[in-house]
């Protein structure tokens, strides 16, 4: 009767024939770790060139200066303008394509502005988190809330957020044609203007803080951003399924990049571990990683 190999010998044999080694030298572990790390954690998304049109013609009447600094980790709340005011006054612009060209709305029962406000605000929050911002998106979930003081509205939610020390930004698209003024920031009034407001104004343009006698959102501490008039290249790139995703990325990235600069948030990166130091070898012109240690042969089994 043949002798049965010991447990240690069997374990050693299994280790040798295993396709996945249970232990690897340090240099191999490091190379595998490097290969698993993404080369660029932010910015690897589709973009298309988007012309947001003219900047606010009221930029020359800017009567405010955003100087209040915010902590780089300040909680940021992104809101979609008119998301809670559909089928009522103040539902937002229909856009040139629907109002003038007779195109069907992007979603029945909702103005195109509200539709794009939702898409853009959501994308800003998504890319903002990738960029390292402490940011989230709020959707009231109910498209018609007639009581402005209802706790579910943008205004009520944004006000609570600001009172708790956060920063709130409501996304809008301006009216087309002569009714529109252009892209720009309508800064918050409650709480005072911040460096984020100032940076956004430099990027997009600005409105006076008391535009139309101080609007409801700024009065509650919520900054409003008009991305641009809902017409021309901007509207076309958003409506075209072939360019829509890239257009949303491009617009959202402009906002995210501007906020990150204002807050001084460094671009996130993944630290690539360095290879272990190798002893100097003057005999060779180029250093190579040490080969894996030789594994002794298993004991002979009688």
Q: Where do the model's predicted regions map?
A:
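Catalytic-site microenvironment of enzymes
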Residues: 2-21, 25-302
